Amino acid sequence: MNDTDLSTFTGRSLLIDQLSSVTQGTPVLDFIDKLRIHFYTTIRQNLLKIDLKNICSLHDLTDQLSDFWLVYEQSVLESPILSPELDRILTCFRCLCRRYLPISVIESVLTEYLDQVLKVWLESKTNPCLDMEKFFQLCEKFKQLGLSSVLKERFVYVLQLHVGSLLTTRYAMSWEQSVYHEALEWIRTEFGVLVEHVFSLSNPAVLVQLDHLVSQILAHLRSDNILDIVLHYPNSLGAIEDLRLVARQKQQRQYLTETFVKDCTSSILTASSDSSYILLFYVSTIRCFVALDPPGVLLDKAAKPIRSFLNEREDAYKCLVSLLFVDGEKGLRSELSQIPTENIDSTTDRFDNYHWMPDPIDAAPDFKKPTDRDVVGSLISIFKSKEPLVKELQLLLADRLLQLTDYHYEVEAKNIEFLKYRFGETVLQMCSVMLNDIENSRFIDQSIHMENYVSKGLHVTILSRLFWPTLSVRYFHLPGPLKKELDAYAEEYRERKRKRELVFLPNLGSVELEIELEDRTLTLTVTPEQAAFISLFEETSTLHIEKAAELLDQPKEIVERHLKFWLHHRVLTDIGDDRYRVRETEAETATETVLDEIQGVSAVQSEAESSAAEMRVYWSFVVGMLTNLGALELERIHNMLTMFIPPPNGYTRTQSELREFLALMIKEEKLEFTGGAYKLK
């Protein structure tokens, strides 16, 4: 600022004389006009010359303007006519200051100054390099000059930055315990006195303002991390409690849900995400948002994109059913055991519901109140139809029951009982029959073994053919001793069940083998096909793969899978020219073999797999097309099959069924899919 003092703009004595002449009987309006003219012609011109570069120049400006007002005030107080109108004249003076002062420049300098003040205040509350008393005097002069709004606006802005930085540094990743009350006490202690001076408020009013500021910042901080908070549930219950306490305003709740949906869409709801992972994420979302907002308004908004995404996933049904039978954090069996208090289709809008409450004000038009906190019910309601879920449930149950080796099906039975609360008895009748088959099989097996008609090691599961899903059956030549035992078992069954016949499914089941070699003994649980294959080496020391296929009466491709299994377990060794022999000692050199994925394939076929298997009759036509025409797209293959396969057994499949079949051929390494087209491998 220039060295020119405001009192010398016209001379202090001259100014007093002019005002004195005005005050003697002159009306108030005339005095105000004189003040405006004097301010405009004299003070304003010098204000335009002020160069506000630092806080010192700001102090000088406020000091001199304050002195200038004291001159006016003295003249007004000396006049009995004007003294009652002091407030009115002060308002006029303040308006002139706001109009002609460079407010934007003042705000810039003041912001920098306030930043220094808050830093020093946090460090030690006192600092010889920064005169806090001088800062408080500056605050008083800002209020006197009508610039308190500028001071408060800038102070709030800087205070928000500092409080936000402090809360972020200390609490950004502290999610296990709620930090809301601790943060309130901390910020009150740090800034309470300073805010009281700046705003001239009593202590209770200051605390209310600081609490509101902390709530706003903490709500924004937790909302920005809402996706990670949900992902870390239940280790983030403290952060959820913070959100429950601070995210109460409509704008805060809207920002919370919008941030969650945006982050969820970009990070979770992607094509590369596994459906099981998304389902478990949805469960965490339900838990978090119900704790945050029990009425369910926020959950309704946050869950819509997740539910829509899962509804479009073809494998979501299968993944959900699989998770219902898995324990621990990676499954939902614990949720399945939580029996809902009401049927999931019931409504809360009943006339006899004396606890009815209106929807929250920020609820969407299609908002429906949750009838309970049944997570499984919420997952089931994702899908428009329950029929695909029931079919997948039947497939999974059949697969699990077929894997049993001791008739103990209590876990599966309990799961089905829990599901009956949600689907009803009638819908799950097929599952009940499958469970009943296992129980009946146990009684029949005990009865047959009680009379020592068959080997103690042979146990059979008897299935009611019409009530089980389609099974993947492959017939092969059984070893003589095993066939004899099975025939004896079937005869005993026929005697007990009035001539009813058993049809064995030879590739289904398991066999416990003990293989004795020269330097070791192996105990393995294998499939009947693998057991039949290795039994071929009891009669010969070496065997050609073609001969093995002939003896088993199976395709070479299937026999190769059995062979890989025994090579992997170092029971057989390759001696060249597709010939193999038993590996009697570990010391023998052999090629390491990686077991392929076929060992984990289920014996139960889904509808898509059954359809693909039935389409093998068209494989020769597909081979002919790809041989003569090269790589072809799905649509062209479909059109050519429709055109060239004549009735009455014409091609009537859909493109979706053809796609499943071609995918199966790719899995069997007969086709390749590149550039959107299929070609022979």
Curated annotation (Swiss-Prot):
SUPFAM superfamilies: Cullin homology domain, Winged helix' DNA-binding domain. InterPro entries: APC2-like, APC2_C, Cullin_homology, Cullin_homology_sf, Cullin_N, WH-like_DNA-bd_sf, WH_DNA-bd_sf. PROSITE patterns: CULLIN_2. One of its GO terms (biological process) is proteasome-mediated ubiquitin-dependent protein catabolic process. The keyword Cell cycle applies. Keywords: Cell cycle, Cell division, Mitosis, Ubl conjugation pathway. Component of the anaphase-promoting complex/cyclosome (APC/C), a cell cycle-regulated E3 ubiquitin-protein ligase complex that controls progression through mitosis and the G1 phase of the cell cycle. The APC/C is thought to confer substrate specificity and, in the presence of ubiquitin-conjugating E2 enzymes, it catalyzes the formation of protein-ubiquitin conjugates that are subsequently degraded by the 26S proteasome. This is Anaphase-promoting complex subunit 2. It comes from Schizosaccharomyces pombe (strain 972 / ATCC 24843). The lineage of its organism: Eukaryota, Fungi, Dikarya, Ascomycota, Taphrinomycotina. The gene is apc2.
